[in-house]
Amino acid sequence: MEMIGGDDTDTEMYGALVTAQSLRLRHLHHCRENQCTSVLVKYIQAPVHLVWSLVRRFDQPQKYKPFISRCTVNGDPEIGCLREVNVKSGLPATTSTERLEQLDDEEHILGINIIGGDHRLKNYSSILTVHPEMIDGRSGTMVMESFVVDVPQGNTKDDTCYFVESLIKCNLKSLACVSERLAAQDITNSIATFCNASNGYREKNHTETNL
């Protein structure tokens, strides 16, 4: 696509269009007739590097996913490796076997396939991306998570999408809470470090003056 002429508004609209198209390409799923797909977006008031540091930990999803009690990874957490996830009681599942399909630290992309477990999420594939975003004048993050999954026999596409979306919404809400709490701690620690350094500088000057 080529842009010719136009004012600043046209440029902004073109930039937004290119961004939207880029995001759609990253979240492109091949959805068969017996499957459903959807994409969810969450805005988080924490810098992208902090959010990504939580998301990328394929070996420790329980850091922010509230329904996971334990995770075991066979080997190093690299593309192609598997993890065994134990699900907390109260959900219609106890275990899930998942494979890491994508892990891009530059583009901030995480892709996962579920290949086994005692649940009904057959042929489940998800892609999660994080993107820098200004929120209320501060550096924040936009998180996008998309999925495709088989519709179980006896269920509708709407019912299946609603169930999976509910789980993802809970995960993203928890991700926001954990990220924003860590961001607040970073700010508090930075202020404390600055204050301590300032106090030390003043004490040093006071001592030198008395001498």
Curated annotation (Swiss-Prot):
The record marks P92, T156 as: Involved in interactions with PP2Cs. InterPro entries: Plant_def-hormone_signal, Polyketide_cyclase/dehydratase, START-like_dom_sf. The keyword tRNA processing does not apply. GO terms for cellular component: cytoplasm; nucleus; plasma membrane. GO terms for molecular function: abscisic acid binding; protein homodimerization activity; protein phosphatase inhibitor activity; signaling receptor activity. It is found in: Cytoplasm; Nucleus; Cell membrane. GO terms for biological process: abscisic acid-activated signaling pathway. Receptor for abscisic acid (ABA) required for ABA-mediated responses such as stomatal closure and germination inhibition. Inhibits the activity of group-A protein phosphatases type 2C (PP2Cs) when activated by ABA. Homodimer. Binds ABA on one subunit only. Binds to CARs protein in an ABA-independent manner, both at the plasma membrane and in the nucleus. Interacts with ABI1, and possibly with other PP2Cs. This is Abscisic acid receptor PYL7. It comes from Arabidopsis thaliana.
